[in-house]
């Protein structure tokens, strides 16, 4: 099975070390463009663009990278409860059309009550997933060309429609990750690819089996992906030294503050990540070549595969054997580590190198009449 390898645009900051200004670098448009073009040339399928109050806006960043890349896809966040599903459907179709079918979407429900409150969202965990389910139903139906009336608990629309369809049909692929039962139910019902963070293989296997069974019970099949950091070097010893250097400037106070912030979230996945190390830095190799040091201060994905190319490739293939076909990777600094992955890891994997998409002809149509309907063809005399 050929593997889809994704990289990451660090719109929330980048550098040589975690938890310190030492070794950091400005993340401006030119730097993000460098990373995107490098990923494009090396053969990555796409890039994940993160979302949240600590990040640059993912949609604007993705749009700005379209003209400077050729085949790279953009995995961009959809934010239920923050954005209307009808507006999000128009945005998604436009991004897909402007990128010639290179748009992918990642459903993000949110987990930090403080951040959500700052965005005007005051739903609890279960309510957010209810709202996300309703959002996704409306979003998918619009992109499939329906005129939508929907009267849900959280979302109400009447006569919603999309004038400009996406290139990818029936709609651009929808990714999603979540570890709670309600999250897995949403994945089984509505998404195309279920993402998990990089837990040890036995735990990942259990989650995949749960989601696969739930999808099958609904008459659906679903793909799987995993989100991991990587530290790849020419030798295993060099890779582990690089891992140690990454957290060399971390002090106990910074770790404690980060763990306290993670503890206030209602994300089951985040709590599972934190439990891998319990905020302690003395036993961070939690599974062969799987290192939890990143999660001491970074929310979300908190583990890295560490080693030389053949070793990391072997670990990736262990995950692939569980049914995972997409790997969303990152590493510090993201420009240099992209080259390390492309040059030291890719030769040991069966990587699905994307082709440059051919331009897709768009439907010819005149300006909408009264913003209400597409004009008819002229009558033949």
Swiss-Prot record:
Claim: Repressor is one of the keywords in the record: no
Catalysed reactions, semicolon-separated: an alkanesulfonate + FMNH2 + O2 = an aldehyde + FMN + sulfite + H2O + 2 H(+)
SUPFAM superfamilies, sorted: Bacterial luciferase-like
E.C. numbers: 1.14.14.5
Enzyme class: oxidoreductase
Molecular-function GO term, any one: alkanesulfonate monooxygenase activity
This protein's UniProt keywords: Flavoprotein, FMN, Monooxygenase, Oxidoreductase
Listed Pfam families: Bac_luciferase
Keyword presence, Acetylation: no
GO biological process terms held by the UniProt record: alkanesulfonate catabolic process
UniProt function note: Catalyzes the desulfonation of aliphatic sulfonates.
PANTHER family the UniProt entry points to: ALKANESULFONATE MONOOXYGENASE (PTHR42847), ALKANESULFONATE MONOOXYGENASE-RELATED (PTHR42847:SF4)
Protein family: Belongs to the SsuD family.
Entry-linked HAMAP family: Alkanesulf_monooxygen
NCBIfam families in the cross-refs: alk_sulf_monoox, PRK00719.1
Other observations noted: FMNH(2) which is absolutely required for this enzymatic reaction, is provided by SsuE.
Subunit structure: Homotetramer.
Protein name per the record: Alkanesulfonate monooxygenase
Organism: Citrobacter koseri (strain ATCC BAA-895 / CDC 4225-83 / SGSC4696)
């Amino acid at each position: 099975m050929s593997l889809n390898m994704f990289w990451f645009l660090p719109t929330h900051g980048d550098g040589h070390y975690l938890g310190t200004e030492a070794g950091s670098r400005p993340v401006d448009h030119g730097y993000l463009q460098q990373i995107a073009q490098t990923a494009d040339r090396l053969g990555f399928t796409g890039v994940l663009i993160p979302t949240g109050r600590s990040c640059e806006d993912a949609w604007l960043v993705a749009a700005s990278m379209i003209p400077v890349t050729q085949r790279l896809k953009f995995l961009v966040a959809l934010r239920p409860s923050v954005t209307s599903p009808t507006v999000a459907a128009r945005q998604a179709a436009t991004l897909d059309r402007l990128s010639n079918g290179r748009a992918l979407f990642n459903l993000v429900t949110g987990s930090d009550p403080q951040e959500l409150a700052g965005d005007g969202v005051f739903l609890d965990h279960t309510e957010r997933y209810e709202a996300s389910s309703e959002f996704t139903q409306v979003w998918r139906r619009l992109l499939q060309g329906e005129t939508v009336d929907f009267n849900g608990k959280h979302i109400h629309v009447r006569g919603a429609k999309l004038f400009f369809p996406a290139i990818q049909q029936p709609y651009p692929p929808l990714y999603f990750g979540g570890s709670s039962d309600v999250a897995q139910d949403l994945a089984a019902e509505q998404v195309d690819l279920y993402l998990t963070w990089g837990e040890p293989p036995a735990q990942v296997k259990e989650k995949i089996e749960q989601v696969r069974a739930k999808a099958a019970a609904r008459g659906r099949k679903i793909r799987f992906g995993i989100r991991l950091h990587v530290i790849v070097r020419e030798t295993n010893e060099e890779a582990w030294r690089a891992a140690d250097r990454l957290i060399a400037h971390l002090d106990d106070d910074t770790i404690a503050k980060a763990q306290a912030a993670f503890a206030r979230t209602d994300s089951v996945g985040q709590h599972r990540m934190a439990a891998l190390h319990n905020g302690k830095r003395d036993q961070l190799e939690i599974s062969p070549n799987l290192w939890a040091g990143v999660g001491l201060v970074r929310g979300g994905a908190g583990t890295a595969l560490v080693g030389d190319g053949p070793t990391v490739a072997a670990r990736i293939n262990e995950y692939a054997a569980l049914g995972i076909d997409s790997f969303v990777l990152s590493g510090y600094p993201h420009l240099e580590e992209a080259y390390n992955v492309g040059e030291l890891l890719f030769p040991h994997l069966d990587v699905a190198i994307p082709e440059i998409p051919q331009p897709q002809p768009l439907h010819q149509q005149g300006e909408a009449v009264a913003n209400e309907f597409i004009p008819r063809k002229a009558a033949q005399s």
